[in-house]
Amino acid sequence: MPDQTTSTHLFAHILARVHAVCAALTDEGALPTGTDLSRIVVEPPKDASHGDMATNAAMVLAKDAKAKPRDLAEKIAEKLRAEDQIDTVSIAGPGFINLTLKPAVWAEALRAVLDAGAGYGRSRVGGAEKVNIEYVSANPTGPMHVGHCRGAVFGDALANLLETAGYDVTREYYINDAGAQVDVLARSAFLRYREALGEDIGAIPEGLYPGDYLVPVGTALVAEHGAALKELPEPQWLPMVRAKSIAMMMEMIKADLAALAITHEVFFSERSLIEGERNRVADTIDFLRAKGDVYQGRLPPPKGAPVEDYEDREQTLFRATAYGDDVDRPLLKSDGTYTYFASDIAYHKVKFDAGFGNMVDVWGADHGGYIKRMQAAITAVTSGKGALDVKIVQLVRLLRNGEPVKMSKRSGDFVTLREVVDEVGSDAVRFMMLFRKNDAVLDFDLAKVIEQSKDNPVFYVQYGHARGHSIFRNAKELFPDLPDATEARIAFLKDANAERLTDPSELDLLRRLALFPRTVEAAALAHEPHRVAFYLYDLASEFHALWTRGRDLPHLRFIINNDAEITKARLAMVQGVVSVLASGLAILGVTAPDEMR
């Protein structure tokens, strides 16, 4: 739940009034001095018919007051009824307090949207805290596939969201360039190198990467080395081919990400942990050993299903069980090289030492079992001062009209991210990847996401923004001086008499606009950008519904030619909708078109 004390939006204002009421009750002796008010929240009620806002104040403070929740609720409600902005107060169930605000509050809320302009929804809740978000981090062994796409979009949108909420965000990509898979990449590229020299390589052997995307690597190796590599033994050519292959794969990956407008500030090489000026992995193991968290020991045989990294031998172990894990974890393999886990601990220590006490990792669904050990390691290596939130991104099922999509010839065994973006566009990909919670499997239908219908959420939301601009264009007849530029148009509409907006559907739309800053804060604190996508769809739905009502009921049309005052008020409301849709879409990394083409 957001720390609403750092917020300036309407919900935070009402929370402040609830706090003031509790302070008054403390003065009267109904609450003890020093009562913790941080547990109080003000939020939309689950049932909109109960009012505009609800608070749990009586429920969480009743024990302190040594009173029944409902009795305390009566005392709080009595004082809240005296507040200028509150119309009615009711008590539900055991002691929940429901509030209905006066209509004038919603007119004022619209003015707040216009006054803030593009800044509406921005927050200081993050307090400029440094946050490192590591996402994508696909192995540098080929082009991005559609599965990578979801994690890429999620991580980028989360970074945008946290920046909007006032965090200092660094976007990072961890290059897995030290494992066996990059040696396989090098051998696969060397085969393409021989092919580029004119050799018939036949079928790609089992265990190597078969995709055509390595053909340009072979060509580049010939341009750089001629036939010289062919005469060298593998231990000599492999490091050179590996480095070239990784570099070209990363350029391909960066180009794929650019198609979705995704960039990273930091690309961190796993290999640099070991081959840099210092061996960071060895340093980290020594650091943990000095704390008593690394020891030489033999793990007991696993119970039930086999553990993938179990070996019946004495080995170097991290005392993960001391930090909540189920079993202690090996740091060295039988051949003396580091486990991936050891490198991962060192990598996160590097981030923590750089000032990132708040770290977010975006992982694929197949890494879910890795979370507990990694969080144990973070607690140990940061002495409890660092926090790691792992967001699991579930699988994407790619469909066309409900049928699974066939694999790509270019990649050999998967559909590439670029193929999907080229077919349906970046906006459709980004919005739909965020229109479901990250830990739920997503069906992505290539045919559905380009439909121009309510059933296509990205179209429906973007159309809301375009429809608003269409209304502005049509209003020129009544208001010839209505500016086209956003800031000038907002300035023109600021003196609109928003109190004329009295229809229940208009007030519902204003309530929805007032909810946006709180939605942003709650989504940021929960690391859940899908909440913004859901909000935008609901806002667009209410806006479209109001437009449709105006078609059937002339007095509700946005433009009333013989009533300039109500028209200007409704244009101000439309501007509020357009501004919030644009701000929300920007968080998701989706464009807000003025016209749909």
From Swiss-Prot:
Any single GO BP term: arginyl-tRNA aminoacylation
InterPro entries: aa-tRNA-synth_I_CS, Arg-tRNA-ligase, Arg-tRNA-synth_N, Arg-tRNA-synth_N_sf, ArgRS_core, DALR_anticod-bd, Rossmann-like_a/b/a_fold, tRNAsynth_Ia_anticodon-bd
E.C. number: 6.1.1.19
Entries under Pfam families matching the protein: Arg_tRNA_synt_N, DALR_1, tRNA-synt_1d
Motif 'HIGH' region: positions: 138-148
Example of a GO cellular component annotation carried by this entry: cytoplasm
GO molecular function: arginine-tRNA ligase activity; ATP binding
SMART domains per record: Arg_tRNA_synt_N, DALR_1
Reaction(s) this enzyme catalyzes, per UniProt: tRNA(Arg) + L-arginine + ATP = L-arginyl-tRNA(Arg) + AMP + diphosphate
Top-level EC class: ligase
Major localisation: cytoplasm
Cellular location(s): Cytoplasm
Keywords: Aminoacyl-tRNA synthetase, ATP-binding, Cytoplasm, Ligase, Nucleotide-binding, Protein biosynthesis
Record note on quaternary structure: Monomer.
UniProt xrefs under PANTHER family: ARGININE--TRNA LIGASE, CYTOPLASMIC (PTHR11956:SF5), ARGINYL-TRNA SYNTHETASE (PTHR11956)
NCBIfam families: argS
Family statement: Belongs to the class-I aminoacyl-tRNA synthetase family.
Protein name (Swiss-Prot/TrEMBL): Arginine--tRNA ligase
Organism: Rhodopseudomonas palustris (strain HaA2)
Gene: argS
